[in-house]
Amino acid sequence: MTIYICGDSTAASYTPEQAPITGWGQLLSEFLPGVRVENRAMGGRSTKSFLSEGRLQKIETEIQEGDLLLIQFTHNDTSDLVWRHTDPWTSFSRNLEIYVDTARLYGAKPVLMTPICRRMWREGKLLASHGDYPDAVRVLAAQRNVPLIDMYEKSLQFVRELGDEGSKKLYLHVEKGAYPAYPNGNADDTHTQRAGAEAYARMTAEALREFGLVT
């Protein structure tokens, strides 16, 4: 069995030179021994641009019966750029159905995932992010009888438990001079470094086991 990942920069794989940024999809195989993971997530992609660039079509030439297709977007679907933007209740949902139908056409099993949360603390409170998109994923999963990994809710709870300062270690907060890729430091509350990627990869693997999709 092979697990294919369709997604954006939060799931994507990175080179050592780009450290410490790390996507959860990059580490998923560490929590699923013996399972082949093909991480096709790519930074800057939405449900729309991933399709228009032929990335799902490429997966179609490889995916086989019994494989899994993990589908996680949103961060770039919210963009104002016309080539990326989708509406949560119309074009976003329709696009997700294309991924679901493609997997099923080849006998593979689709798995829908809500996005990981943004680390948005204000006055001691963790703010909601992503608008209606997580709900749109949940509704479609129920309508189409697709397993749902609610990473948005899982990550919100995890970040909230760690608190404002404690959750910085999950995301791309680095000191000046600590990494060549970030000579001036960084404070990014969307992308993860290894600690965050490990946590979210572990949650994903655990959910797949709970669904009985992997052993």
Question: Could you describe each region identified by the protein language model?
Answer:
Residues 8, 40-45, 84-85, 121:
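Short, basic, glycine/proline-bearing loop/turn elements
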Residues 13, 47-48, 79, 121:
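Glycine/Thr-rich phosphate-binding loops of Rossmann-like dinucleotide-binding domains
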Residues 1-42, 57-65, 69:
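Serine-esterase "nucleophile elbow" of acetyl-processing enzymes
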Residues 46-54:
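Structural motif
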Residues 54-198, 202-215:
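Alpha-helical cap/lid subdomain in secreted, periplasmic
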Residues 45-46, 150:
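Short, solvent-exposed coil/turn linker segments
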